[in-house]
Amino acid sequence: MAVNQTMGRASISYGSPVFIKASGSVVGQMESEGPLGSYFDKVGTDKDDLFGADSWEKAESALQKEAVGITLQKAGIKAEDIRYLFAGDLLGQNIASSFGVMDYEIPLFGLYGACSTCGES
């Protein structure tokens, strides 16, 4: 039975509480040297800011994909266990996010806040 989750034109409500079971973070060398450095799950090297990709856009997608993979592993769940994924990126069209997570086949809410994505979600 489908449940109507809409509350308004741009709002939804969930039938049960929302929670975060795990998180995953992938950053470059510079971010790891800051005050939060010990909290990141994976750090690139100063020799490869692109994480093996041939463009910044592909690198950002790779970081998104890796972060989701780390999160799934830490939570001990599969992609099909996740109902929604909230993601945003520094590209104005959510290209890096959508390409980075598309193999997981999780419904994606694209957030357009760039650096404020964490707060928005």
Annotate each PLM feature.
Residues 112-121:
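Active-site-proximal alpha-helical scaffold in enzymes
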Residues 1-109, 113:
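Conserved "HGTGT" condensation-loop signature of ketosynthase/thiolase-family condensing enzymes
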